[in-house]
Amino acid sequence: MAETATIARPYAEALFRVASESSAGNLGAWSELVSEMGQVAANPDMKAVAGDPNVPGDKLAELFLSVLKSPLNDEARRFVKLLVDNGRLTVMPEIAEQFHVLKNAREGSSDVEITSAFPLEGSQLNDLVAALERKFGRKLYAQVAVDPSLIGGVSVKVGDEVLDTSVRSRLAAMQATLTA
């Protein structure tokens, strides 16, 4: 994981720089394209083709580009060819993640992972996200998961910060206090 992140970082930073300076579209359109590229590269069939040494690079790039549904500009085509030429197409999912982090940093926003013991309804989720935005002082994009093992409450992760108000964590804290 760390090795993949190290390999992907310069590509993500270069692509972000190109996207920021490009007149071919806004950062949102680039973000959607890069996310799609990451999803396609993560596909097991595409991984198998990318890992096959018998597939020529130009054919691999052509195949990859043909699978994408988003409109492509010349910069994106050259980027894919660069990845293929350097044998780094399989790193595209990590490049997409790092591109997204760079975009969020530019916009002053973050992703938030909310894990709840029960499904959150629309107003509950909106109120929770609004409270978290006030706490963290930036726009948050929520990804919600349900984990019944929490028993009750929620666990929130924004970047490297974790707020765990679940019943499970409170019980674990009580157990630690009682056994100490």
UniProtKB/Swiss-Prot annotation:
SUPFAM superfamilies attached to this UniProt entry: N-terminal domain of the delta subunit of the F1F0-ATP synthase (SSF47928)
Any one annotated GO CC term: plasma membrane
Protein name: ATP synthase subunit delta
Record keywords: ATP synthesis, Cell inner membrane, Cell membrane, CF(1), Hydrogen ion transport, Ion transport, Membrane, Transport
Gene3D superfamilies: N-terminal domain of the delta subunit of the F1F0-ATP synthase
Taxonomy, superkingdom: Bacteria
Molecular function per GO: proton-transporting ATP synthase activity, rotational mechanism
Originating gene: atpH
InterPro entries according to UniProt: ATP_synth_OSCP/delta_N_sf, ATPase_OSCP/dsu
Key word Acyltransferase present: no
Subcellular location: Cell inner membrane
Database matches in Pfam families: OSCP
Family membership noted in the UniProt record: Belongs to the ATPase delta chain family.
Subunit record text: F-type ATPases have 2 components, F(1) - the catalytic core - and F(0) - the membrane proton channel. F(1) has five subunits: alpha(3), beta(3), gamma(1), delta(1), epsilon(1). F(0) has three main subunits: a(1), b(2) and c(10-14). The alpha and beta chains form an alternating ring which encloses part of the gamma chain. F(1) is attached to F(0) by a central stalk formed by the gamma and epsilon chains, while a peripheral stalk is formed by the delta and b chains.
Function: F(1)F(0) ATP synthase produces ATP from ADP in the presence of a proton or sodium gradient. F-type ATPases consist of two structural domains, F(1) containing the extramembraneous catalytic core and F(0) containing the membrane proton channel, linked together by a central stalk and a peripheral stalk. During catalysis, ATP synthesis in the catalytic domain of F(1) is coupled via a rotary mechanism of the central stalk subunits to proton translocation. This protein is part of the stalk that links CF(0) to CF(1). It either transmits conformational changes from CF(0) to CF(1) or is implicated in proton conduction.
Cystine pairs: none
Membrane topology: Peripheral membrane protein
Transmembrane segments: none
